[in-house]
Amino acid sequence: MKAFGDGQDTEDYLNLFLSGAPLLDTRAPVEFHKGAFPGAVNLPLMTDDERAQVGRCYKRHGQQAAIELGHRLAHGAVKESRVQGWREFAQRHPQGYLYCFRGGLRSSICQQWLAESGVAYPRVLGGYKAMRRFLIESLESICQEARLVLLAGHTGGGKTDLLARIPGAVDLERLAHHRGSAFGRRADGQPSQIDFENALAVALLRQRHGFANAPLLLEDESHLIGRCALPQSLRRAMAQAPLVVVEVALEQRVEHSFRNYILHKLDEWRRRQGEDEGFERFADDLRQSMYNIRTRLGGLRYQQLSEMLEAALARHRQGDPAYHRDWIRCLLEDYYDPMYAYQLQKRAERICFRGDAAAVRDYFAHSSSTTATVRDKRL
């Protein structure tokens, strides 16, 4: 039996994703931006406009006329440029694969043109559509079969940092590129919903195959992380999963929130927009986040916190960011903590362990006892 990545066309989607094989996506940019796989590179056979022209031709005159039009649109220097891009990808990634939407004509043409230029490069049979279907089915299966455990705790408790120190945990916020709370927006935005789902499915596959005997540890999230929605199958599994609660003192949570939502967020905006514009975008980001929760805060509390935020921004412009701690502390004490305490109380019977970060790490380090506890809790 030949090893995976042996240069042959494949429909072994599991090993394709587990191995992290380089993927050359030959679909049009509009298709790629709607949804793609982690790390895939888009070097299309046709531009969006060319694809639209070929599609109209196919509807009016049939497949052969559409193929002929496609060859007329991508010929000469245009064809040479695209083939050169594929050649360079193949040279950089000899263990990779190319694909189109269905694994049909477009990827066959790309493969043929590459072969004519002296490069044999394999393709994924079934293409993007079959790979996407495989990931959806895998995610459904994992959510039904895996022993989930949720890491819970008050806002600002460093749960994401703790997850990173526990082998086999899956970081949903990293996949969604969002810090989870109302203030969790990142400067460079979030993936599309389909990109998020694909990345999540790949992460779950790798966790299950790399840590088969461990429970699947996720952070206790709501159904939305920013604008990325958790799949229904995962939400159902999370609604029944046992909880491990990390307990962190208020002042530690204030400091953690200050670093992440002020210092790190400002750095992100400045890297993206420059020093001055970056600060203004950062300030608007905080204002908008506060505005988004104004109804839940109530009119008076929203006004008070907004005034504290503006005062902190004014001092920050003068070089002193420390005053942000004041409104962060109030927001945690008066808004987030009561809300989360209420939510946690409703699920108190699902709590299987609670302690500080060191105790939680120790709890998960003893995987055999963790497994037993989780199993008992679900029976």
From Swiss-Prot:
The active site is at 100 (s-selanylcysteine intermediate). One of its GO terms (biological process) is tRNA wobble uridine modification. Residues 17-140 form the Rhodanese domain. It comes from the Bacteria. Its EC number is 2.9.1.3. Disulfide bonds: none annotated. Keywords: Selenium, Transferase. Transmembrane segments: none annotated. GO terms for molecular function: transferase activity, transferring alkyl or aryl (other than methyl) groups; tRNA 2-selenouridine synthase activity. The keyword Transit peptide does not apply. Signal peptide: none annotated. It catalyses: 5-methylaminomethyl-2-thiouridine(34) in tRNA + selenophosphate + (2E)-geranyl diphosphate + H2O + H(+) = 5-methylaminomethyl-2-selenouridine(34) in tRNA + (2E)-thiogeraniol + phosphate + diphosphate; 5-methylaminomethyl-2-thiouridine(34) in tRNA + (2E)-geranyl diphosphate = 5-methylaminomethyl-S-(2E)-geranyl-thiouridine(34) in tRNA + diphosphate; 5-methylaminomethyl-S-(2E)-geranyl-thiouridine(34) in tRNA + selenophosphate + H(+) = 5-methylaminomethyl-2-(Se-phospho)selenouridine(34) in tRNA + (2E)-thiogeraniol; 5-methylaminomethyl-2-(Se-phospho)selenouridine(34) in tRNA + H2O = 5-methylaminomethyl-2-selenouridine(34) in tRNA + phosphate. Belongs to the SelU family. Involved in the post-transcriptional modification of the uridine at the wobble position (U34) of tRNA(Lys), tRNA(Glu) and tRNA(Gln). Catalyzes the conversion of 2-thiouridine (S2U-RNA) to 2-selenouridine (Se2U-RNA). Acts in a two-step process involving geranylation of 2-thiouridine (S2U) to S-geranyl-2-thiouridine (geS2U) and subsequent selenation of the latter derivative to 2-selenouridine (Se2U) in the tRNA chain. Monomer. This is tRNA 2-selenouridine synthase. It comes from Hahella chejuensis (strain KCTC 2396). The gene is selU.
